[in-house]
């Protein structure tokens, strides 16, 4: 009898490797902390891989390398993999291009872009990737079974969850950009000026969060049907838009004498992400796989109203950067947690007052219950 390993095994291995990385970052008396961190990242990945091997072997799934290049299945996977890699990496290519452009700007521009991108990628990694991980296998199974009705239901569920989470998160990231950066990064070589410059780019990045999360949900709708060319085509369009907008915005801001032209790079990234998501959504609508019916539009309207209520609270109670700078680290942490906690309560409270119930996003497909549990586990870890 094959024994199934715990479904949370990858999460525990990831947590174990993350602990190792964190411990290495605070290694005492290190003359070269950069080298220590680089080695720690490598060892953390090795630990994670080693942790998974016994569980793979326990249910006869331990990989044995065999180069079956002539196998039809391998050829099909390679044919799908190459365009999928490029299409799904559009945002990473955009970030790499923006980093290249930032290298020609004032000193510190690369760091400002990097720090703000890290804060943007956190909710994407926590919510967007977790949602994509849960949705993809379900869509693949339903596509293989030619069950279009449940395929639509799963996709609709993923889109609604992505919007319910990403819209308020983007607005919160915009309003709380200063407090977040001050709490996490301020101190040492990271000066008040760096705080202001990083805040500008994070504010421009924030609305790209919606596009990034939607891309992570919409792309599996194509990959699950073995259509890798459509996301590739739209990804290339998004990369082209990012390149053109980045150069246009940066050159315009430099010509105008603005002291923070790197904000143009972040703004171009957000625009490209939204364009990519919009193209994917339009294609799915044309294929009658996504329906913008009254219930969907009604849900979006309530999300917007609840987000506005949350924004009013944050704008009213958030303080200027100078106050955050003068506060101690403990006070910053508790103040930030208070603002985030209350804003979450206000957001979902207003949603429920407007008649929202979780049954509206109850999945109607044959998705297994453990996939929902895995979504929660991925988010928690």
Question: What is each of the regions a protein language model found here?
Answer:
Residues 34-38, 53-91, 285-303, 361-363:
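Interhelical loop/hinge segments that connect adjacent transmembrane helices in multipass membrane
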Residues 34, 80, 102-122, 191-199, ...:
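Interfacial/gating helices of multi-pass transporter permease domains
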Residues 291-292, 316-381:
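Membrane-proximal transmembrane or re-entrant/amphipathic helices at the cytosolic face
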Residues 129-147, 218-219:
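Helix-loop junctions and terminal segments of transmembrane helices
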Residues 78, 114, 135, 143, ...:
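Interfacial transmembrane-helix starts/ends
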Residues 4, 17, 207-237, 247-248:
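Membrane-interface junctions at transmembrane-helix termini in multi-pass inner-membrane proteins
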Residues 1-23:
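Single conserved hydrophobic/aromatic residue that forms the stacking wall/gate
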Residues 174-208, 259, 325-330:
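Interfacial segments at transmembrane-helix termini and the short loops linking adjacent helices
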